[in-house]
């Protein structure tokens, strides 16, 4: 089971439901029928799962940098959130692509904010990942990770693929060419609808491409 950081609201909801089910089972075993009358367990949660208000988004906005979107996990699916990436003016295009990719990767591997955590957002992307541009002989839009894509958890790979594929780091065409810095193999991954809706069901669709 991959480690997903964040999503406190979702985790609490699962624990409450599990405890309620266990209690109902115990009552039934004692010959006591569970009540159908609504019970007051206190105020409802203040955050709607997987939704951030305009106020919440405003309080998180970084005043500088290139506005970008990354995909976090929420309720078992990929959901877009706003971030920003710092890119120095005048950065050469090939270098700019790698800088944006690293900024996106850093944003994905960072713990969600307190507001996002409360709303159920989480991430499976491990900290410490790095990304570089194409090696000699690679397609110009290739990106190479410090960890092989197929060695990442499915949730993490789905987050990375969909975030990169939807950004200037990969040409914003719905796919991204990924490999590792320790192997020659490259694959073009697609951010398919099923990848966004059920990232844990399998790796994103991919095809092998020529590399260095």
Show the residue positions of the predicted features.
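Bimodal "functional hotspot" detector
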Residues: 1-212
């Amino acid at each position: 089971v991959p480690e997903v950081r964040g999503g406190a609201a979702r985790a609490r909801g699962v624990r409450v439901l599990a405890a309620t089910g266990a209690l109902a089972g115990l009552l039934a075993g004692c010959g006591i029928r569970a009540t159908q009358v609504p019970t007051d367990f206190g105020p409802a949660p203040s955050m709607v799962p997987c939704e951030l208000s305009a106020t919440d988004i405003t309080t998180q906005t970084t005043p500088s940098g290139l506005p970008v979107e990354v995909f976090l996990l929420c309720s078992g699916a990929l959901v877009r959130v706003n971030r920003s990436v710092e890119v120095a003016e005048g950065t050469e295009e090939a270098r700019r692509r790698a800088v944006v990719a690293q900024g996106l990767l850093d944003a994905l591997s960072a713990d969600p904010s307190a507001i996002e955590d409360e709303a159920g957002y989480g991430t499976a992307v491990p900290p410490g990942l790095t990304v570089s541009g194409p090696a000699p002989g690679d397609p110009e839009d290739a990106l190479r990770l410090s960890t092989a894509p197929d060695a990442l958890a499915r949730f993490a790979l789905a987050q990375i693929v969909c975030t990169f594929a939807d950004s200037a780091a990969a040409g914003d065409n719905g796919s991204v060419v990924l490999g590792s810095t320790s192997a020659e193999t490259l694959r073009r991954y697609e951010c398919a609808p099923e990848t966004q809706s059920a990232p844990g069901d399998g790796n994103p669709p991919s095809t092998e491409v020529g590399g260095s």
